[in-house]
């Protein structure tokens, strides 16, 4: 049953899409939208944070805001659990993550583009507002560090890797040679070692974040974020294309789920369903849900939705923007979970990589290899 893993992947993607049209519509009815109600984008329209934008542009910005590197790194690590990881992404997205994001966005629209701490204080009292503000500050600090450090590490690795290619240090499929040369200081970029290159990228990304925050939303966020969001989608489509083409390759086929099929034989339904059960030292509960959070359910998204709630032109666009962006993030998470399942030769190789710490280099190598 060689096609079983591929069918499972596309089944999960299909369920997510169906969930958007069916359950998303149910959630929209529960909220009771009013298309005739003026949104904060028109009520305030201060030319800074509040201004109307097209729903496609807002959707791409919202996708990038809530996604980042979360639905890439988490699902790759979560691939250790096999196909049950993809089941969690589907269920989590449809019934929890997308619902959470939709209501956060729509509540913000209904209350003048208010943030979650303000809404918590309005309905639950000042003590709750203080608590949520403190919690949000701590979490945003932690998430901000990750969202600066992880791209900087990745870009630093890619920079050193590409420079290694230019020096002739990389032959086809020999990424480890470059890695060892980089770590040993044998490869430098303009006289800088890897740590310095990463520090430079960190400064660049941090400066970009500050600039994007201080300027009006349409100057940087409204112009650059949609492009980055489109690139995120394009990259995921490229991953699927690479997997499918490699899967049907006559010379070097890549099985979609080869990490759970160690004996090299065809994957049977019995073997497939074994991966929906607890596997001894890697219990599904609660580790799976902690490993894959951003791709299925994340409370951090509540801090991002007011940004786009202030630019939404009509309440009827909320399902596409907020619910739809989370469903799209779920699709991206499914793609990268499949990348993790297809990259390693067997379950032990994947386990060893995770046990040793899945560094940015290894994640970068996965992307390059599958591409």
UniProtKB/Swiss-Prot annotation:
Name the PANTHER family on file. Answer: CARBON STARVATION, INNER MEMBRANE PEPTIDE TRANSPORTER
InterPro entries from the entry? CstA, CstA_N
Q: Does the keyword Transmembrane helix apply?
A: yes
Where exactly are the transmembrane stretches of this chain? 4-24, 60-82, 87-109, 130-150, 197-217, 224-244, 282-302, 320-340
Q: Can you quote a single GO CC term? A: plasma membrane
Membrane topology recorded in Swiss-Prot or TrEMBL: Multi-pass membrane protein
- What protein is this chain from? Uncharacterized membrane protein HI_1126.1
- GO BP annotation list: cellular response to starvation
| Species of provenance | Haemophilus influenzae (strain ATCC 51907 / DSM 11121 / KW20 / Rd)
The listed locations are:
Cell membrane
Keywords in alphabetical order: Cell membrane, Membrane, Transmembrane, Transmembrane helix
Q: Name one Pfam family in it.
A: CstA
Q: Which family does it belong to?
A: Belongs to the peptide transporter carbon starvation (CstA) (TC 2.A.114) family.
